Amino acid sequence: MGDRTEEEIRPLPLNSYTEAVDWINGLLPFGIRPGLERIELMMERLGHPERRLKFIHVAGTNGKGSSCAFLTRTLRECGYHVGTYTSPYITKFTNRFQYDEVDIPETALLELANRVVPLVEEIAGTDLGSPTMFEVSTAIAILYFAEICYPDVVVWETGLGGRMDVTNIVTPIVSLITNIGYDHMDVLGDTIEQIAAEKAGIIKAGVPVVSCVEQPEAITVLKTTAASKHATLYLMGEQFHYERLSVDAKEQQLHFKGPFRDMDFTIRMLGGHQCKNAAGVMMVLEVLRQYMAFQLEDEQMQDGFRTTFWAGRLEVIREEPRLVLDGAHNPEGAASLAQSLPEAFPYRKLHLMMGMLANKHHQGYLKHILPIVDTLILTEPDFRRKMDAEALYELVAELQGTEAKADLEIIVERDWRKALSLLESRTEREDLGVVTGTLYLISDVRAALLHQTDSEKGW
C-alpha cells in the first residue's frame, strides 16, 4: 500500500457532525468583528474557491431571508441548480447551507469543518486573531458550493451590514439591497445615511444593483455609490414599480412594471412588505434574463413566486387556536407586522407573545406593535443575548399610557414554554395569537408546536 504521509496518519480533529457544529459555535466568543482580512487569508490558503462561483449578493435591514427564498425557489423552478447561504437558521445548523433547497449533508459539513480546522488554528496564532464563527461558516459554504455541489448560481445573504461583512469577499453578478432601517446600530451607525453607506458597501464596480430602499437620504447614498462604481442602479419607484392587485389570508396578487416588460404574478407570502421583496427579486431576475442570458420563462417564474415559503414570516403554524409566527425584531419589522396582521387575519382580539435580544431598538419596536395588542405576554428567548423580561416590561410600562390600548393586559413569564401555554389558552376561536420579537424565540416555539426533535436553533 506504500507509506502514508504524516498528514494522512494524523487523526481528524472532529469526529462527528455534533463535534463539528460545537467547534464552529465555540468560535462565537470571538464575536462579530467586521473586517475581511481573516476571510481573505482563508480564501488565499484554499486557492480562492470563491472565484469559481456566480453569486447574487443580498443585503438589507429586513427582507433578506424572504428575498433569498424568492430567488432560490424561482431560479430552481426555471431549471437552475442553486446554492443558498443564509442566517440565522430556524431549525438546524445545516439550514444555512443549501443546494437546490436541500441542507448540506452532515457528513459533508464534518468533512469541510475538518478541512478548515488547521487553517483556523494557523490564523488564530497570528496578529489577526482567530476567525469567527461566521467567517468559518462562510468559508465552509464557499468550499461546499465550489468543490462539492457546483451550483449554477449562489444566493448569498450578508450577515451584518455589507461593506465590512464577511460575505463581501465575493464579486457577484448582481446585488440586491432590500431596504434600510434601524438595526445593529452599535456596529453600523445610528443614522440612515451611515447604515445605508454600510449596506452600499456590497456595490461592486460594474455590477448591477437592485434596491427597494425608500428613504430619500438612503437613496442619495446608493445613487452616489453606484455612480462612483459605474454600477447600474435599478431603484423601486424609479426604474421599476409594483402595484398590489389583491390580498387575502392565503395569497397576494401583484403587477410588476419594469424597464424591460410588465408581469402579473401571485405570492403566498403574506404582508405588504413581501410585495416589495418580491418586486425587488423580480427586478433581479429581469437583470439576469436581459443581460446574463438566464433562460427564465414567464410561467416558471410565476410558479416560483407562487410556491415560495419562508418559515417564521407571518407563518400560520396552527389553526385552532390560530397561531402565527413572525420573526420581526426591529422597528421596521414591527411596523410591517402591525400593518399586516389586521390586513391578512380578521380577528376579535390579538394576543401577542414576545421576547427580544438585548441589543435591539426596543422602544421603536414597541411603539409600532403596542397599539394593536389586547394581551401582551413578555418572555425570554433561550439565547445568551436575551433581553430580561422584567426590563422589557419596564419599557412597555413607560409607553403604555400613550401607545397602548387602555385595557391592555400585560403578563410577564420568563419561561417561554409556560408563556406559550398561556398564549394558547388565551387565544379563542375568533382571536389571533402571535409569537414574535426574535427568530431565536420563533425557532424554539416552532419546534415545540411541530414536535421537531432535531431542532438546534441559532446563528
What are these regions (language model features)?
Residues 71, 75, 138-145, 280-288, ...:
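Buried hydrophobic packing segments
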Residues 2-15, 25, 170-172, 193, ...:
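ATP-dependent carboxylate-amine ligase
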Residues 52, 148, 153-158, 165-176, ...:
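Nucleotide phosphate-binding/pyrophosphate-handling subdomain across enzymes
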Residues 1-60, 67-78, 85, 121-128:
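Short functional linear segments
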Residues 12, 36, 40-44, 48-51, ...:
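ATP-dependent carboxylate-amine ligase catalytic core
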Residues 86, 212-213, 227-247, 267-272, ...:
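Beta-strand->loop->alpha-helix junctions that form or flank phosphate-binding loops
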Residues 123-126, 150-153, 157, 172-264, ...:
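Acidic, Mg2+-coordinating active-site environments of NTP-dependent enzymes
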